[in-house]
Amino acid sequence: MSKPIYVRFEVPEDLAEKAYEAVKRARETGRIKKGTNETTKAVERGLAKLVVIAEDVDPPEIVMHLPLLCDEKKIPYVYVPSKKRLGEAAGIEVAAASVAIIEPGDAETLVREIVEKVKELRAKAGV
């Protein structure tokens, strides 16, 4: 299956796993915003340190604005394959189309690693 239109670069599986782990740790020891509405507000206000966007969102219009908004606000973002797993990592019983890490807590090093890797991936993809 091809990637949705809002996915601008390919994220390797190991990096996606780190993103799930970062969300989980930030939820336990820092602060996160769950869901597209809260994530959008956090990005618009410049509070997000990292935005995690699920690739299996249907309809894609739900999260289509996030990569552009993140670029505009200079906030890094990464994709993960599953909204269900993203919801679990965020500590909710339903799927989450996106999550914003506001305060990484114990995930600070992990978030930094993800941001650096995303910079490399985006440079390779030319976005």
Curated annotation (Swiss-Prot):
Q: Could you confirm whether the keyword RNA-binding appears in this record?
A: yes
List the Gene3D superfamilies. 3.30.1330.30
List, alphabetically, the InterPro entries matched: eL8/uL1-like, Ribosomal_eL30-like_sf, Ribosomal_eL8-like_CS, Ribosomal_eL8/eL30/eS12/Gad45, Ribosomal_eL8/Nhp2, Ribosomal_eL8_arc
Entry annotated with the keyword Ribosomal protein: yes
Keyword set for this entry?
Cytoplasm, Ribonucleoprotein, Ribosomal protein, RNA-binding, rRNA-binding, tRNA processing
One GO term in the molecular function aspect is: structural constituent of ribosome
One cellular component term from this protein's GO annotations in UniProt: ribonucleoprotein complex
From the Swiss-Prot or TrEMBL record, state where the protein is found: Cytoplasm
Task of the protein: Multifunctional RNA-binding protein that recognizes the K-turn motif in ribosomal RNA, the RNA component of RNase P, box H/ACA, box C/D and box C'/D' sRNAs.
Query: Which family, according to UniProt?
Result: Belongs to the eukaryotic ribosomal protein eL8 family.
Sorted alphabetically, which HAMAP family does this protein's record hold?
Ribosomal_eL8
Would you tell me the protein name for this molecule?
Answer: Large ribosomal subunit protein eL8
Species annotation: Aeropyrum pernix (strain ATCC 700893 / DSM 11879 / JCM 9820 / NBRC 100138 / K1)
Question: What lineage is on file?
Answer: Archaea, Thermoproteota, Thermoprotei, Desulfurococcales, Desulfurococcaceae
- The coding gene here is rpl7ae
